[in-house]
Amino acid sequence: MMVDPNGNESSATYFILIGLPGLEEAQFWLAFPLCSLYLIAVLGNLTIIYIVRTEHSLHEPMYIFLCMLSGIDILISTSSMPKMLAIFWFNSTTIQFDACLLQMFAIHSLSGMESTVLLAMAFDRYVAICHPLRHATVLTLPRVTKIGVAAVVRGAALMAPLPVFIKQLPFCRSNILSHSYCLHQDVMKLACDDIRVNVVYGLIVIISAIGLDSLLISFSYLLILKTVLGLTREAQAKAFGTCVSHVCAVFIFYVPFIGLSMVHRFSKRRDSPLPVILANIYLLVPPVLNPIVYGVKTKEIRQRILRLFHVATHASEP
């Protein structure tokens, strides 16, 4: 429900997204590089999914998890970019209240799913390096599928209360969001009622999901490092080589996320463009960089991509 400043019920059931505060005049031109990054992200992640699906030798847990990561990256960037581009190019700044809640749920739940998949990938590397003889029996295809389903259920279940809590709040101050899309931290600050439940639950989610996942990933790599240090130099190089891409993906996801969360929680200036810029980085950079990192650092994927380009080049020749 939304109410007017006098406390009466209002017919307004929408929010206004202003895009990048302080950069309104530049938004039209900024949309072009953002659109290019979005297209690169979608194309890159679709390429990863296609390669893993069509290359039988890549039907292993690590690459199946990579496909899950690519699918989530496509969805998380698509949940925000079309509306953002509509704001920047067509000044379509309004978003219906329920649509805002749906977008909020999509962005936050997909982020939770991505964190879970990154944790699963760390577990895969731990088993492959520390217990190589048990890898095939521990991470079977049915078990990998169950982990993927668990990632979806966990992300959705943790974030489902957020729109429910927001739905209960009255909004009598303003319906203007200094942002390009709807995030829980921004919407709850517009409420004219006590938001402690939203704040506390938001912190619980960050600690129990993102915080716990990052700690478990760090712990798994400590165990991996302990095992690798006892190997020969050649074996060390091979083991580290299989982990580089995942470590990069972890940093690409968690560093912007933690930075964004800290700025949102502790920033006093609502009109500052910093949280919005960080949010755009958080939702666009991982989907763009993950396929590049895995394409460059993973030999099997790199060779398959080069083969695709080779076939496409010869097919275009007269």
UniProtKB/Swiss-Prot annotation:
One Pfam family this sequence matches: 7tm_4
Annotated TM spans: 32-52, 61-81, 101-123, 146-166, 199-219, 240-260, 276-296
Extracellular-side positions: 1-31, 82-100, 167-198, 261-275
Keywords, sorted A to Z: Cell membrane, Disulfide bond, G-protein coupled receptor, Glycoprotein, Membrane, Olfaction, Receptor, Sensory transduction, Transducer, Transmembrane, Transmembrane helix
CC annotations in GO: plasma membrane
Main location class: membrane
Glycosylation sites: 8, 91
GO molecular function, one term: G protein-coupled receptor activity
CDD domains attached to this UniProt entry: 7tmA_OR51-like (cd15222)
Disulfide bonding pattern of the chain: 100-182
Compartment annotation: Cell membrane
Alphabetical list of PROSITE patterns matching this protein: G_PROTEIN_RECEP_F1_1 (PS00237), G_PROTEIN_RECEP_F1_2 (PS50262)
Function: Odorant receptor.
Protein family membership: Belongs to the G-protein coupled receptor 1 family.
Name of the protein this chain belongs to: Olfactory receptor 51E1
Protein source organism: Homo sapiens
Gene that produces this protein: OR51E1
